[in-house]
Every structure is written in structure tokens, then in C-alpha cells.
Amino acid sequence: MRAPVGPWADDPLWAGVYDWSVEHPRLGRLGWRLVVGSNLSLLYDAVAEIGRLPAGAAVLDVPCGGGVALRGLRPGQGVTYIAADISQAMLDKTLAAARRRGVAEQVVPSLADVAALPLADGSADLVVSFAGLHCFPAPRPAVAEMARVLRSGGVVSGSMIATDTGARYEGVRRLGRRVNMLGDMCSRAELVAWFAAEGVPDLRVTTSGAMAYFRGVKA
């Protein structure tokens, strides 16, 4: 029986709530506003960048979770979509979502630890990590690996719950850590500094409630 809460890698029931909220915009937008004070449209806008990649491009989605970012991938787009996650259960959910969306032939599953990605340096044109960095045990090594596999001129994009978005959301952060849904997390300033140290200068960060959306280009 699935537990209601716990680490995302264990596929708790709460992970399904996250996926459902993204796939049902009308109620999802309301839920995101109430829980984390965030505009769900920012996620949809960020995911849409995947659909603008040309044929032959490679995108890494880590952690892919239930496959919510697949909504940006177009059938017949001709890209290689590497779906990486430390949980086989999450990979299975992503593959099921890919089949429903008619994009399964573009998706390559990879059972992997974000701190040691099995990809060559500079092999990805786009790296996305939506609602991922706040789940990792240590976000700093994850940032280093995401930047390592990104090619020069490639884009990194994602979202996370940040530690410095105000006291209003401290209850969300504390509860998330208590039930093992959230890891160490980091501040927006730390995220910018870490990516800059890894060759991604001028990371753009947009704050929406407890969430921070980020996008940068590797030098």
C-alpha cells in the first residue's frame, strides 16, 4: 500500500496529487495558489520551451517524476527526451504518460542519481528540473551535474521551493521536511551562485509564492 506522504522516490500518494494538479489546470491553479501561493501558469510556460526544440535535439528531464513536463513534448518532434529518475516507479509513470501523449518513441528512460548522471559532458541541449531541486538530499551536487551535461549555449530551466521566499511559507517548508517530501533545499541566491560557478552566469529567477522558477544559458 502506498503511503500518503514520504520521499518522492517512494511514489507516495501526494506525488499523484502533484501530477493531477498539473494536468487539471482549473483546479490545479487554485490549489497551487492556496498551498504554495504560486501561479501554475509559470510552469506551463516553462515546459512549453521543450516543444520549441528542433529535431535532433536532446533534452534531459531530471527528476522526471510522473512525467508532467512531457506536456511540452510534441508528437513527431524528433528529439531525444532523456527521462531520468532515481525511482523506477517514477520512470514507469513517465513512460505511461508518454504513451498516453503519443510521444513514447522519443522518451529514453534512465534510472539514475542526479548526483552522478550517466551522460557525457555537454550532451544535452536543454536540461529541465521542475519541482526537483527541493526534493534532492543535496541540491549543490545536482546543480553541478545538470550544468556538466549541458552543452555550451544550452538552456537549463526549472522550479523549486526556495528557502528564502518569506515567513509565510515556512510552514510548508517545515512540514515538507518533516514528512520527507522535501530535502535540504536552498535559497535563490545560493542557486544563482552555484550555477554561476558551474558556467551558467546570469541565471534568471522569477519568484511566485514559495516557488522560484529559474532559467539560464551555459557559457
Predicted regions: what they are:
Residues G51-L53, F136, L150:
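A generic alpha-to-beta junction signature in SAM-dependent methyltransferases
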Residues P12, G28-W32, S157-F214:
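C-terminal alpha-helical "lid/dimerization" subdomain adjacent to the S-adenosyl-L-methionine
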Residues A58-A116:
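Class I SAM-dependent methyltransferase SAM/SAH-binding core
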Residues L126-A138:
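A short SAM/SAH-binding and catalytic strip from SAM-dependent methyltransferases
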Residues A58, G153-V155:
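Short glycine-centered segments of the SAM/dcSAM-binding site in methyltransferase folds
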Residues A115-L126:
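A short acidic, Gly/Pro-enriched loop at the edge of an enzyme's catalytic core
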Residues M1-L53, V68, G72, R174:
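Conserved class I S-adenosyl-L-methionine
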Residues R140-S152:
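A short glycine-rich, Lys/Arg-flanked "PGG" loop and its adjoining helix->strand segment in the class I
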